[in-house]
Amino acid sequence: MESQQLSQHSPISHGSACASVTSKEVQTTQDPLDISASKTEECEKVFTQANSQQPTTPPSAAVPENHHHASPQAAQVPLPQNGPYPQQRMMTPQQANISGWPVYGHPSLMPYPPYQMSPMYAPPGAQSQFTQYPQYVGTHLNTPSPESGNSFPDSSSAKSNMTSTNQHVRPPPILTSPNDFLNWVKIYIKFLQNSNLGDIIPTATRKAVRQMTDDELTFLCHTFQLFALSQFLPTWVKDILSVDYTDIMKILSKSINKMQSDTQEVNDITTLANLHYNGSTPADAFEAEVTNILDRLKNNGIPINNKVACQFIMRGLSGEYKFLRYARHRYIHMTVADLFSDIHSMYEEQQESKRNKSTYRRSPSDEKKDSRTYTNTTKPKSITRNSQKPNNSQSRTARAHNVSTSNNFPGPDNDLIRGSTTEPIQLKNKHDLHLRPGTY
């Protein structure tokens, strides 16, 4: 019966989209070629949905051998479907670059959901664990984000349960320039922390709290590829990906170190712009401070030539050192070492002048001490002719009174005086000398 109905109609052309229909589907009296174009499109949609929900039956089993039916080898049968995604959007090997990242013009052209970048390491059931992003996922980096900011909280406070991920976490923006990569990483780290992955992210002071799982590594790779397009990655990031295109954690660690370095660079340049020196501190300390700043900037890829460095230094000089701003204006090739040589010379002259002033300046108390010392050292000592000590039982006044009495009332031949030739005579004079009577 079925063969008679097929023989009554004209043969099916090789280009028909319904060439793979089964014998049960052609039991209608209407010629399948007379179906309108709208019904044909509807048939194709139904057919596509049917193939996506149930395994496709091989053409050899679907179409029985019939001499009046079109040959299945010559008919253009639709390509078999590979999962729920159309074949024409699958990533081909030609779409991958040397670093392993597929080349997409825009994330909306992503052939897989955000967490199925490649079938080779898409874990089973990964789609049910992570958030599926809506169509506004393609925002740019300059779009304001509530999670964006220059600082992010400590990753130790984040949870690690991926099944409880916030369903309303805003995704990071799309990277549009290599110069904005570090700013993009700040927002991306904030996004990971809001997705309960903060404890797998290392910081500048410590390593990650725990090691990530395979599902979390897949999540990291997928989101990084989705929002950081390969053509906008810096060179050093591409170098890391060329070795291992899944080593996203190394990229994040190096980015954090670069952020810290950039902060130090800003501080160093600010310090150079606000230098101040007036000789209150040693010249060696000032030179060491400036030299360390210049060396740090040079090591971080920001070399400062001698002309600019000398301008920074001279602008900070004040007081007597302000003269150095104009002392070497004729020298075009002046170096930082030459300028510091002048600063050292002026500092030594300043210190020598201070020492000389302190030497010539004398206080009144020091002058009194010097005068007293001079008087004591020039006072003559008393001289005695006899080794016998004088009698000190009487006072000096009494002895002088006795001598004067004996002079006023002398005895015959001055017996009193002659009788005491061995005793010294006390004379009241300004030198307080003790003389013998014979020498008076």
Curated annotation (Swiss-Prot):
Residues 363-372, 429-440 have a biased composition (Basic and acidic residues). InterPro entries: TYA (IPR015820). It comes from Saccharomyces cerevisiae (strain ATCC 204508 / S288c) (Baker's yeast). GO terms for molecular function: RNA binding. Residues 1-75, 137-174, 350-440 are annotated as: Disordered. The keyword Electron transport does not apply. The gene is TY1A-DR2. Residues 1-31, 137-168, 373-409 have a biased composition (Polar residues). Pfam families: TYA (PF01021). It comes from the Eukaryota. The lineage of its organism: Eukaryota, Fungi, Dikarya, Ascomycota, Saccharomycotina. Homotrimer. GO terms for cellular component: cytoplasm. The keyword Cytoplasm applies. Retrotransposons are mobile genetic entities that are able to replicate via an RNA intermediate and a reverse transcription step. In contrast to retroviruses, retrotransposons are non-infectious, lack an envelope and remain intracellular. Ty1 retrotransposons belong to the copia elements (pseudoviridae). Residues 299-401 are annotated as: RNA-binding. This is Transposon Ty1-DR2 Gag polyprotein. It is found in: Cytoplasm. The C-terminal RNA-binding region of CA is sufficient for all its nucleocapsid-like chaperone activities. The record marks H401, N402 as: Cleavage. Keywords: Cytoplasm, RNA-binding, Transposable element. Capsid protein (CA) is the structural component of the virus-like particle (VLP), forming the shell that encapsulates the retrotransposons dimeric RNA genome. The particles are assembled from trimer-clustered units and there are holes in the capsid shells that allow for the diffusion of macromolecules. CA also has nucleocapsid-like chaperone activity, promoting primer tRNA(i)-Met annealing to the multipartite primer-binding site (PBS), dimerization of Ty1 RNA and initiation of reverse transcription.
